Design a protein with these regions (language model features):
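Conserved acidic catalytic loop of the alpha/beta-hydrolase fold
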Residues: 78-96
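Short beta-strand/loop motif that positions the catalytic acidic residue
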Residues: 194, 200-202
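Conserved alpha/beta-hydrolase "nucleophile elbow" surrounding the catalytic nucleophile
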Residues: 29, 96, 100-102
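Conserved alpha/beta-hydrolase "acid-adjacent" motif
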Residues: 207-212
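Catalytic active-site module of serine/aspartate enzymes centered on a nucleophile-bearing elbow/loop
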Residues: 228-254
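Hydrophobic, aromatic-rich cap/lid helix
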Residues: 162-187
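Flexible "cap/lid" loop of the alpha/beta hydrolase fold
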Residues: 106-150
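Conserved HGGG/HGGXW glycine-rich cap/lid loop of the alpha/beta-hydrolase fold
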Residues: 9-67
Length: 254
């Protein structure tokens, strides 16, 4: 495990693939997950290295082996987006592809709106048209993380996130703080600022994301791919997810 410091927090990351790779890529995982579970275990490290790319995957603040403050103010979405660029600075990388899943997709979109010039291709997965719809009660995810037992959680989606957090042995109070962190609403007008080649991917059965085309339509020139038969979680390991990403990088989906 390697570390870098961002905003006073020690954040863990992995580097993989050839150090002199033709291009770099940064991977940003989803809520309650970590770099190992979201990417390495699902075969992404090997796939990226096999494509000759220099890869980086970080544990977002509050997750995995990174620092886990319990103060919601430390999870400002803008700050979490800056963590991506701080990792790139630490590694001496000026530009990179950026791939984010679920929460990581929100972070990647924020990064692209703030400093898109450092991003080559942008891929956001596990998100779709529902990004523009009112979500669950704002504090519901935090309360699910704070519940004494998953049995106290009525909402099936929230319960699944809680079970996953328990399986990963994550710090549930840090996750609760993360879910309460300040963030700007992603609007269609705001997304017009993204001027990088963008791909939106979601599973056909992803009830959390909704159809990816609904988000792609809001980003100039963006493409959308639906992974058949997959829900929010099962698409991560699907071969078509990987194939779509690499085809996009190689220009086949342009």
């Amino acid at each position: 495990m390697a570390q870098f410091t961002s905003d006073g927090l020690a954040l863990a990351y992995d580097e993989f693939g050839p150090a002199d790779g033709r291009k770099a890529i940064v991977l940003v995982h989803g809520f309650s997950s970590n770099r190992y579970e979201n990417w390495k275990r699902m075969g992404w490290y090997d796939a990226i290295a096999g494509k000759g790319l220099r890869g980086f995957a970080l544990d977002c603040r509050g997750h995995g082996e990174s620092a886990k403050p319990h103060d919601p103010a430390r999870y400002d979405r803008e700050a979490m987006a800056k963590d991506v660029f701080t990792l790139m600075d630490h590694a001496g990388v000026e530009r990179a592809h950026l791939l984010g899943f679920s929460m990581g997709a929100h972070i990647a979109l924020t990064a692209a709106m703030n400093d898109g010039g450092r991003i080559d291709h942008l891929v956001v997965a596990g998100v779709g048209g529902k990004i523009f719809e009112p979500g669950r009660e704002p504090d519901s995810m935090a309360k699910a993380m704070e519940a004494a037992s998953p049995d106290e959680i009525g909402d099936p989606m929230l319960k699944s996130f809680r079970h996953f957090a328990d399986e990963q042995k994550e710090d549930r109070l840090a996750l609760a703080a993360c879910s309460r962190g300040p963030r700007s609403t992603l609007t269609r007008d705001a997304l017009l600022a993204i001027r990088r080649p963008t791909l939106v991917i979601a599973g056909a059965r992803d009830q959390l994301a909704g159809p990816p085309q609904g988000l792609a339509d809001a980003i100039p020139g963006a493409k959308a791919v639906v992974i058949p038969g997959c829900d929010h979680f099962s698409m991560i390991a699907h071969g078509l997810f990987k194939a779509s990403v690499f085809d996009f990088f190689d220009g086949w989906l342009e």
